[in-house]
Structure formats: structure tokens, C-alpha cells
């Protein structure tokens, strides 16, 4: 099964995403509503899975845990038991994605969202060839100690528009920001077989398209 992963994040001009486990900027209500809408919108009778590291989980105010109307999965190599309020615990992103194929989840999960922190974002960007990044671009700098990985435009394409994502610049509390969506570029390699067929192969996929040459 080829699984599409979605990372959603807000970054400042230096790709900073946090400071001491909290947002470096004041709460931006429209961005918060955007996060809620994107991560909860799902097809009927299914819910989205939100995957987060232990620190991200505990940075959420206890009264708001778990994130409602979503399946909450926490990643940790140290925790032995599922944190109170969470639904699942996995040691790694790879283990988490294997859980989705299990009977208890396979018919319940619609979309998969990675919501932090930095190392989990990095793992997702390295793991999947089918990946979208939903980036809230804060158009100023803040004091931060945690960063989002570099978005290499050799590997990612900035989409001109995307359904449900506002294209105009937002402003709240004197802070301007915009919503961006990036799609990971899947390279296709061509080679000719001895039978005279041209085969296009996409890395890490069991997908092959043949045509006569």
C-alpha cells in the first residue's frame, strides 16, 4: 500500500517552529482554525490519524488532549505505556505506519497527518516519496530553539493552489503569514528492456508502466 503522508507546520522566516516546547509567536486564531479544519476533515465513517512525538503531545494543554475527532498516535522510544488520553503508542514512524495496516485501524483511517516535532518531520520527509507539506509561513523572525528541516526545491514543488487552502496573505496581531503547500517530486527513471519495452519506474513504489518503443 502506497501511503500519502501530510506534514502540517507553522514556521518563521528562519524555519523556526518552537521555543521551549511552545509556539514562539502569539496564537493566530485563523491559523489554528486552519490546522483544526485540515487535520479533522475526513470521509464519512473514518477519522484522520495525527502522529506526533512525545514532546509535542505533552506541549498540548491537558484539557485539549487528545485532539478531538482524530486518532492520536504518540511516538516515543522511552514511554512504556500509551500516555493518558492518547489512542496509540509507537516507537518509530515506521512502526506507526505499520499499525495503520492492522485490523483495528485499516478501515478507520482516512488521512495521515504529521504534526511535530522536528525529528518526526525529518523522518517523514526522509521516509515517504508520497508527501505533502502544509506550511504556514510566518513572515517575520522570532526567537526559536526548534526548527523545521530545509525544504529543498529540487525535491519539492510549491503548488500554485490547493483545495481548501487560502491563497491570500493573512494578518493577525500585527503578524503577516500565508499558507503554502509543497508536494514531493517523485522522480521517474526510464530504461529499455531487451524486449523493446520502455519501462518507467518510480522509486520505492511497486508501480511500473510499460509502453512499446
Curated annotation (Swiss-Prot):
Its EC number is 1.5.1.3. Pathway: Cofactor biosynthesis; tetrahydrofolate biosynthesis; 5,6,7,8-tetrahydrofolate from 7,8-dihydrofolate: step 1/1. It holds the Pfam family DHFR_1. It catalyses: (6S)-5,6,7,8-tetrahydrofolate + NADP(+) = 7,8-dihydrofolate + NADPH + H(+). Substrate binds at residues 31-36, 70. PROSITE patterns: DHFR_1, DHFR_2. Residues 4-184 form the DHFR domain. NADP(+) binds at residues 10, 16-22, 54-56, 76-78, 116-123. One of its GO terms (molecular function) is NADP binding. Keywords: NADP, One-carbon metabolism, Oxidoreductase. One of its GO terms (biological process) is dihydrofolate metabolic process. Key enzyme in folate metabolism. Catalyzes an essential reaction for de novo glycine and purine synthesis, and for DNA precursor synthesis. Belongs to the dihydrofolate reductase family. This is Viral dihydrofolate reductase. It comes from Saimiriine herpesvirus 2 (strain 488) (SaHV-2).
